Curated annotation (Swiss-Prot):
InterPro entries: Papilloma_E4 (IPR003861). Residues 24-85 are annotated as: Disordered. Phosphorylated by host ERK. The phosphorylation triggers a structural change that enhances keratin binding and protein stability. Keywords: Early protein, Host cytoplasm, Host G2/M cell cycle arrest by virus, Host nucleus, Host-virus interaction, Modulation of host cell cycle by virus, Phosphoprotein. The lineage of its organism: Viruses, Monodnaviria, Shotokuvirae, Cossaviricota, Papovaviricetes. Pfam families: Pap_E4 (PF02711). Its main location: host cell. This is Protein E4. Contributes to multiple aspects of the viral life cycle including viral genome amplification, suppression of suprabasal cell differentiation and egress of newly formed virions. Induces host cell cycle arrest at the G2 phase by associating with and preventing the nuclear entry of host CDK1/cyclin B1 complexes. Inhibits cellular DNA replication by preventing loading of host replication licensing proteins MCM2 and MCM7 onto chromatin. Within the cytoplasm, associates with host kinase SRPK1, a splicing factor regulator, and inhibits its activity. Residues 24-38, 53-66 have a biased composition (Low complexity). It is found in: Host cytoplasm; Host nucleus.
Length: 105
């Protein structure tokens, strides 16, 4: 089992952007189920680290439920657009004001 831990290299990309993991759940759910299905009791730092992605876990869950998000966007009057390395969230408040948030990665 020690051999299975050795081939776990750090992220493949030289520059690692945690926000990219939030936006691209395809790359994140692969490491997460491995950690959840193989709980190592002798790696407490890993468990501490799992808490950090758990905050993003809610984000990856929500991006996993894209139909639900689209359904909510119709009711809540907000939309998300992804263009290249930027994500734009546009929302309308009940008072009619429009709020736009753009994340550039």
């Amino acid at each position: 089992m020690e051999d299975s831990e050795v081939p776990r290299p750090p992220p493949r990309t030289t520059t690692h952007y945690p926000l990219l993991d939030l936006l691209r759940p395809q790359s994140q759910p692969q490491p997460q189920p491995q950690q959840q299905s193989r709980p190592h009791s002798r790696t407490p730092p890993r468990r501490h680290r799992v808490r950090h992605p758990s905050a993003s876990g809610s984000s990856s869950d929500s991006s996993g439920n894209s139909p639900t998000l689209r359904g909510r966007s119709e009711k809540g009057r907000w939309s998300v657009k992804t263009t290249g390395a930027s994500v734009t969230l546009t929302a309308q408040t009940p008072g009619g004001a429009t709020v736009t948030l753009t994340l550039c990665l």
